[in-house]
């Protein structure tokens, strides 16, 4: 899908009102830690391996651009985004994506992530991801929001989902494993 700009806050508010008048709840999705190529193009310094030549992705698929959870500016950015969401979307839910994040190719090799895991005694990137999702959830809870996530089987086996998370399957055949 070609990149064709963005919605203004006012346009989003009008869309939410239009949908609400028809009984439809609009739930925003802010993808983390991956699927954020536009963010990588705008703020390459937020990522484990910054590349100032990153372009906005115009097709589907997975990239190696994962935000680095150990850069303070990343958390300031998301705090501001979550505050703005509260003013635009009355829904009590924010979907965080959370799928198709190649942790073994990014966080596993990120110097800041490696240092953090060593300091905290974490055995792998899945423990780091669980903590990351929990922190994102806490930040949204301040604004009265709860999270939803896409289901990833390896992450479920690693027990990254926290109590109260709503998880959706999107890959064929995975639904039975989400309810076990």
Q: What are these model-derived regions, one by one?
A:
Residues 1-143:
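Substrate-binding cleft of carbohydrate-active enzyme catalytic domains
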Residues 42-46, 105-107, 148-180:
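Substrate-binding cleft/loops of secretory-pathway carbohydrate-active enzymes
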């Amino acid at each position: 899908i070609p990149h064709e700009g963005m919605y203004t806050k006012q346009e989003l508010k009008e869309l939410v009102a239009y949908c609400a008048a028809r009984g439809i709840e609009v739930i925003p999705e802010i993808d983390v830690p991956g699927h954020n190529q536009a963010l990588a193009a705008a703020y390459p310094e937020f990522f484990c391996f910054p590349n100032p030549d990153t372009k906005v992705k115009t097709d589907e698929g997975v990239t190696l651009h994962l935000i680095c959870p150990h850069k303070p500016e990343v958390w300031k950015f998301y705090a501001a985004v979550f505050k703005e969401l509260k003013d635009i979307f009355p829904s009590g839910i924010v979907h965080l994506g959370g799928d198709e994040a190649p942790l073994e190719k990014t966080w596993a090799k990120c110097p800041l992530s490696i240092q953090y895991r060593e300091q905290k005694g974490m055995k792998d990137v899945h423990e780091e991801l669980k903590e990351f999702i929990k922190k994102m959830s806490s930040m949204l809870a301040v604004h009265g929001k709860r999270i939803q996530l896409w289901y990833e089987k390896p992450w479920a086996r690693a027990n990254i989902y926290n109590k109260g998370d709503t998880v959706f399957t999107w890959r064929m055949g995975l639904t039975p494993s989400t309810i076990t």
